Amino acid sequence: MQPALASQGVKGSVTNALSAAFLGSLGGGKSFANNLLVYYAVLYGARALIVDPKAERGNWKRDFPEIADEINIVNLTSDERNRGMLDPYVIMRRPKDAESLAIDILTFLTGISSRDGNHFPILRRAVRTVTNSKRRGLFCVIEELRKEGSPLAVSIADHIESFTDYDFAHLLFSDGNIKKSISLEKQLNIIQVADLVLPDKGTSFEEFTTMELLSVAMLIVISTFALDFIHTDRSVFKIVDLDEAWSFLNVAQGKTLANKLVRAGRAMNAAVYFVTQNAADLADESLKNNIGLKFAFRSTDIVEIKKTLEFFGLDPEDEGNQKRLRNLENGQCLMQDLYGHVGVVQFHPVFADFLHGFDTKPPMKAGVAV
């Protein structure tokens, strides 16, 4: 398989979209297949950035010594040394991009809409002032709001500051004095954030807890940071791999970001791999039309089966199609290639190292019979 081929205008292809979707419930082989394709792409010269919210790839340097020198694992914990590392003003290279992301994150956390004529202009003005200052950080936005002094500005400052009480939130807020930033110089870069609390799949945005809001906000920051990665050397094929993508595809800012990543990827020889549970997560028409390769693993839910078949452009009411998806074995998936062909594909580990290195099952205690 050549994941970079779609953009080359190959005769007979029905898509030039580089991005891919990996769909399926837990335990069907979705993560294994995704990891294997990324690994081989890197082995053959691609560069990759994996957003790993469940921190399942921390073992890769140990388990894959042949490429260990080209693996960069960034593990962001709530330790003091990581303070502010995910602040938009720290993580983004261009001040304008940092400003845009700061607005997105602060409106996401506070629920202030751009259509709110009372609160939004005050927040926008404070962010712009910080962007034009020498000292930039989200804590500086709080300071700027307090300087303005109006009851509304102070209320917004109090609201934002209430999020900083969580140790976990220290990653998002800097005082403008942070100098170090995340480096993506290696061929295979993995960003992990410890203690993320992702909302359950069916949880609506209005029901998010504070920890869930902060967790999704951090994923949005990291995924936006991926834009900088995409805009590197156009001659090198790149992959941005978004594990648990459903967690931010379910919020407006996340959907906008996903479309932005895919569009930038098309122009910059980069693929975005969405690893998610349901086809409905990628139902947005503009996003769906920019996904070339599709992989669907076993599902037993008839509603989900029909949505997946529809996503593949197949008849969702055809019982043969439904049965095929329902009866897939572990490691098997329904795949659609760049020529529009659909068929069942089996992913074989070939080497035991892959089976062990990509294993996401929790370890069992010694002596426990299986």
Locate each region found by the language model.
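A generic structural motif
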Residues: D52, N72-R81, V272-F274, E319-E329
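Conserved P-loop NTPase motor cores
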Residues: L5-G28, A33-V38, V51-A55, K201-Q322, ...
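Pre-Walker A segment
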Residues: M1-P3
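Metal-dependent catalytic core segments for phosphate chemistry
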Residues: L76, L198, R298
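P-loop NTPase motor domains
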Residues: R62-E66, G84-R263, A267-A270, R324-Y339
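Beta-sheet entry/capping signal
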Residues: G45-L49, E70-V74, Q187-L188, F237-I239, ...
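Walker A/P-loop NTP-binding active-site region of P-loop NTPases
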Residues: G27-D87
